[in-house]
């Protein structure tokens, strides 16, 4: 029989092999020519298997052979390898040549070795019938197409034939049926359901098993399976079990009775009620006033247990830990906003109703360092008018609280007033007197007021320094950010009204214009708004360049008209000092000053939108 199986010596290129029959007795069989891209592994279908079997012994050298080519795809290889073990092939040496390894030999005339073709290309090939199905099969999901019309083996668990569920659309019945099968109640199925049955142990006698089931025969729908454990009974409250032989330890599906789906609905399982001592019970199950009904008539007691399994279950009281405490929740969750909250970090973010003027926005561009800022640097704080200057000066505690409320407050140093020399006070008096004499109509009164005011300020300063009080309170109007509260002797320019010292004369002039007077020499050329400082005008000019709306600010001259002084000396003095100092640098003054003591320290140059030039003469 060695010649029966011929190894096809095919080259690696995979040329097709030919099987031919020279004798006339074999001419009735069709000639087969294999091709690499056709279904070669089925071989030639023989019409006369008996004649072929005789020819197999008579002329073994002419036996038609099926030779698979190396270029078979993976599907054909895997299908043929499944039947390789059933062949009685000729033993070959273990190290085979590389061109012979993929060659697979299958005997042609053995129909039992032919694999199933699930594709069913044509009727020329073998088509074995499918696996016999179960009793009833309503599903052919994931099954190959049938060639002979027989049902295929179902591969899912939804093979029961269900009745139509009311209120379900067509096409959705399978989802509903799967949900019904997932539950423990399979009474809707027409076939015997897989009822969970508790198998009694071997120690239980037949008389005991018949005694357990005797009370449950009349009502098979409400008869749970006997269980020695009460917890398992609660987990399966609707198990359906009918009478069975007393000597059996297993459930025979043929003797089970199935309740019709048209019958009365099953009752809820008897559960223990949750007893609460409060007037309004709060059940943990979610509702505030719902309690489950009490079922007095429970299922018949079992002889395997001494007492009712449900009666021995503990009762549940109300959980006080789960009740919501309003005080605890409100204190944690409710965050009421505080009404007096102010954001001092941003200059333009304000929540209070302040009287805002653009003069109050001070810019550090015109200062040499942070110590040169004046005491009345107002950034988002209430403005101080010139008429109520003494009222603000007398209110010490309120100003101190406003200073501490700023975001970038520095540590305060001790307030010490250094005694100024008489020469500096005399020179300041001479300067102010010369400025006052240059002003027409105010020469006599202004000079007299300046001398008296300066002398009184210097005398009070000298008395304070001589008494050696280390923390003598100065004017509480010092609200600038990060400034030195001790007077530096190098700051020669002293304000005669508030004793504020400056290194530059232009800072002193700006201090007078911003705080002590209401003169606004800088005017916006687009909207006509006037400002007392050039940097405020430059800041205002950006609003026109960006196309934003210019907000009107209340004129401070007309807002407060009640004088806080008995005599108008501070206003007249401030106007005289400003115009005298601005005479040499600005063309908008009313008189020309020829005094050489007040030099040209800064030049605005008639261009208020540009930066001021600084020339130190200290």
UniProtKB/Swiss-Prot annotation:
GO terms for biological process: cellular response to calcium ion; cellular response to heat; cellular response to oxidative stress; positive regulation of cellular response to oxidative stress; response to starvation. Residues 406-416, 608-618 have a biased composition (Basic residues). The keyword NAD does not apply. It comes from the Eukaryota. Residues 417-432, 443-458, 582-597 have a biased composition (Low complexity). One of its GO terms (cellular component) is cytosol. Transcription factor that is involved in the response to heat shock, oxidative stress, and poor nutrient conditions. Controls expression of oxidative stress response genes such as ccp1, cat1, cat2, sod2; as well as of heat shock genes such as hsf1, hsp30 and hsp90. Negatively controls the expression of the fumiquinazoline (fmq) cluster via binding to the STRE motifs at the fmqA-D promoters. Plays a role in virulence. This is C2H2 finger domain transcription factor sebA. The lineage of its organism: Eukaryota, Fungi, Dikarya, Ascomycota, Pezizomycotina.
